Amino acid sequence: MTNCKGRSTITKTNSKVHDREGFVNWTISLSTVQSDKFLNLLLSMVPVVYQINQDERHKKVNGVWQDGLQPAGHNYNVKSDQHVEYHHFSEQTFHGSNGHSPSSCSPKYDDFSSYNYCDGMDASETDAMLQEDNISSDSNEDIIVEGIRKQPKESSSIMALQILVPFLLAGFGTVTAGMVLDIVQHWDVFKNVTEVFILVPALLGLKGNLEMTLASRLSTAVNIGKMDSPIEKWNLIIGNLALKQVQATVVGFLAAVAAVILGWIPEGKYSFSHSILLCSSSVATAFIASLLQGIIMVGVIVGSKKTGINPDNVATPIAASFGDLITLAILAWISQGLYTCLETYYYVSPLVGAFFLALTPMGIVIAAKHPATRTVLHSGWEPVITAMIISSIGGLILDTTVSDPNLVGIVVYTPVINGIGGNLVAIQASRISTYLHLHSIPGELPEEAKGCYYPCRTYYGTGVNNKSAQVLLLLVIPGHLIFLYTIHLMKSGHTSLTPIFIAVYLFAALLQVFTLLWIADWMVHHFWKKGKDPDSFSIPYLTALGDLLGTALLAVGFHFLWLIGDRDGDVGD
């Protein structure tokens, strides 16, 4: 306040705030102000402000602010059918100079999306991404963020139509990848360095570990309004692309190590030159494919937002539309090129691997400069690495099956069944995650989601997630029939389309997706209850399980067909 001589004075205030911090000691230095600004200055000192009309701002009854104003420290989540806006205040100002520095994991939930996932739990990727970190330094200006948004209402028919086109695109992409794999399996590198087959599911699984996770995370960010600001949008995009390149390089290297170990265990044979070739091929493929797919993914997300399409329905399948084809083509080309140089130019392979590994620090520096990805450099590796290991086990099954000349027909169908299963379960996981972000806070489940999870609960009901599970399951059989007929028309593969083969294949595909959607219903809610972001944690596990289940069920199906006499040795060879 100012004294009679116009000099500024210091006002000290002790206030008891009903929050976790107890007593708060504020020391506020006020310069000379005009009388007409005095009321606004007092209002700016209130630690909780609800942005409403100016005339309602002055209402006060019995010491309690009305029409949405709560006492200091009570940051209630307000649900409304209309858009609700919050005034986001600075925690540093709130804590003042009482000696308590604001924690990076302090509880401030101005809306559901800004919940801090590191609140006594493991930090997750969306923890840093979806929080409101951009607090203005001007304490006299209100920063308005959008609050609770309603999930877009969709009928089953609209949902199916939105999913159908990207689903078919993704399916044809996996069909093309399967035909490419059917061709390249006869190349020298695939014949002499069979561990490359172990790399195939692990590297194709990167779309589930990274691309689909990015797609689901950005889709959630779009639906809850976190990409409305251009600055915030590009911070999310640039930071996450740099982070994704770091993760892709590390996972590619670890996938090669896993392939070397899993390839060595059955026969006990080890080749150092082959190990270097695997590492270089894997790292280079992961880096290049991840960069290309990441750019495509960002374009899809931004385009979906501008056209009004729900990105949850289209982003994840489009992320996989050309992902398998791009990754497999790059892997085959690089590995074959390095293999031809193995004898004459032996130094080319280690130089290629060293070059892409040397780019990792640059990606770390870029990612560390963005608040959205800084914390993820120290966390979020668990699901990515675990999913890579699960996919590598599926690759070992594929390598073992392909080594049997009677079962080589499995090659063309493996990317198809794995890709389709992963696409469908990623859509469901992304939709459930968006629903939870809009209707609950991490650590707390909605009432309808509590209890034991069983298949009937996943597929029977009138909830939006029940309907999406039904739609996705109904797409399995007609979708795979289209893809099987496409493979038949292209005269690819080593298996003819007999009725018994179609029945066995469709049963394996249906069982895979049925199991994955059931697991997804439990897993997404499980991670949400644990306070972990399901966009970052569930999708890598689910797509990896899709690879493992698809490859295993397909291998069992081909063994069954061979036992009952449905045998085709060289169809389309």
UniProtKB/Swiss-Prot annotation:
**Subcellular compartments:** Cell membrane
* Function of the protein: Acts as a plasma-membrane magnesium transporter. Can also mediate the transport of other divalent metal cations in an order of Ba(2+) > Ni(2+) > Co(2+) > Fe(2+) > Mn(2+).
Q: Which family does it belong to?
A: Belongs to the SLC41A transporter family.
State what protein this is by name: Solute carrier family 41 member 2
Residue ranges of the TM segments: 163-183, 196-216, 246-266, 283-303, 314-334, 348-368, 377-397, 407-427, 470-490, 500-520, 544-564
**What UniProt keywords apply to this chain's record, in alphabetical order?**
Cell membrane, Ion transport, Magnesium, Membrane, Repeat, Transmembrane, Transmembrane helix, Transport
Q: Which intervals lie on the Cytoplasmic side per UniProt?
A: 184-195, 267-282, 335-347, 398-406, 491-499, 565-573
Q: Which InterPro entries match?
A: SLC41_membr_dom, SLC41_membr_dom_sf, SLC41A1-3
Q: List GO terms (cellular component aspect).
A: plasma membrane
Which GO molecular function annotations are given, in alphabetical order?
Answer: monoatomic cation transmembrane transporter activity
Q: What is its main location?
A: membrane
Chemical reaction(s) catalysed: Mg(2+)(in) = Mg(2+)(out); Mn(2+)(in) = Mn(2+)(out); Co(2+)(in) = Co(2+)(out); Ni(2+)(in) = Ni(2+)(out)
Topological domains annotated Extracellular: 1-162, 217-245, 304-313, 369-376, 428-469, 521-543
Its domain of life reads Eukaryota
GO biological process: any one?
A: nickel cation transport
Membrane topology, from the record:
Multi-pass membrane protein
